[in-house]
């Protein structure tokens, strides 16, 4: 297990800027608005050949607002999980009451963990002199850095990695990556929390309370699963601040990163245009897709309610009807593990390899069932087929003239191939080549 380093402190002291520098990414949203990072998220980092995990947190505060209270609870949970704590303060705003309060809390409750007092935004000697006041916290010698410029970060990291326990050999990460996607407030974080059995994500009725992508792990039937819970995709016209826009970009990137996308929709709202855009985006990126109709416990049901609901969805998504639809409730935990099992099966379908001999037996069968016709009356000969895709199913059909293959015959071949080899939940690509 990689050591976990938690970045903690009051809002807007530069935690996300340091997180981005350590993880060499823009995974965390940075902004001058206090509380921009409202949840925990984790990324891989490496220094001097030593790998570790770094965790960003929302911020330590005493605000009575329910959302800030939840953010505070998440910060305390992050400290409890961490192996090393970087307690960050802001030299430009000076020593604050919250800094003193948090230092007392750390000294009282986490004596067994290495805690580093990190004075951030120190870009000049004068600021370093002013930073001496943070010695009043009674913690270790302060480390003066500029997360933005990189000053002092190398020396800090040398000390941090030296505090790690002896390194152990780690196995290659073979976890299947599942992106939990959907519009705001459809229950994505509640779904993840119900699976993990812990309040890993802030859950609130306020749309958009998860603005970043968050990674969590679980095991299912001996298989490692990485859950990527993303910010909801809003209609572009509703994104009126840079923060929300950047979060929607993060969702795009989460889809890019995953093996299978789990699209959650609200049972009472149904499938909307933005959901269809998300599905199309995932399909274009050749990802596995599963639609999860959440809050099914709120729907009054008759004998054929679920079938009628599924039929409406399939009418809306048209030629993407190979996507499975499941009905779940994050609140009552109905079908949650069935959803994960379906996602795992979809992931296996995405990696499925069919031998050339099997494919050509299939081809001869379908050609005998329905020989291809052409508009011009010219003869079309499909000679053989083979699988060529490395990361998702791609099949090359070799024929005398690819231009003669009609679109309806292409649909027929795809339908029969899916029926024969089961590619449920997975986009399948066909290439027609001249031979």
UniProtKB/Swiss-Prot annotation:
The keyword Lyase does not apply. Keywords: GTP-binding, Nucleotide-binding, Repeat, Ribosome biogenesis. The keyword Repeat applies. GTP 1 binds at residues 9-16, 56-60, 120-123. PROSITE patterns: G_ENGA. Pfam families: KH_dom-like, MMR_HSR1. GTP 2 binds at residues 182-189, 229-233, 294-297. Residues 3-168, 176-351 form the EngA-type G domain. Residues 352-435 form the KH-like domain. GO terms for molecular function: GTP binding; ribosome binding. One of its GO terms (biological process) is ribosome biogenesis. Belongs to the TRAFAC class TrmE-Era-EngA-EngB-Septin-like GTPase superfamily. EngA (Der) GTPase family. Associates with the 50S ribosomal subunit. GTPase that plays an essential role in the late steps of ribosome biogenesis. HAMAP family: GTPase_Der. This is GTPase Der. It comes from Chlorobium phaeobacteroides (strain BS1).
